[in-house]
Amino acid sequence: MASLMTLEVLTPDQYLMKRKDIAYVLLNTVTGGIGILANHGPLIAVLGEGTLKLQDGNNHVILLYVEGGFAEVKDNKVIILTPKAELAELSLIHI
């Protein structure tokens, strides 16, 4: 079994998500994409507007739209602070 991380997503209005079963996070930063796996080194990043890709331990993909913000990675925990976030609707995604 792959190592897993905790992910928290917070906006000024709500605590949108807390998951303890995240295997991979693809952050959309202002300087490009950064992939995060368990045991990643500490990191603080400025997020750009766009979609973050999350993958849980069962290989299910979750897409999360954020309007910028910050990400902190430390001790197998990823915290996303953003002014606005929404889970992507699968019906809106063209594959």
What are these regions (language model features)?
Residues 56-59, 84:
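Short, polar/charged, low-complexity connector loops/linkers at domain or secondary-structure junctions
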Residues 1-3, 60, 74:
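Short loop/turn segments at connectors of secondary-structure elements within structured domains
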Residues 54, 61-65:
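Helix-adjacent hinge/juxtasegments
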Residues 64-91:
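Mid-chain, well-packed structural core segment of small domains
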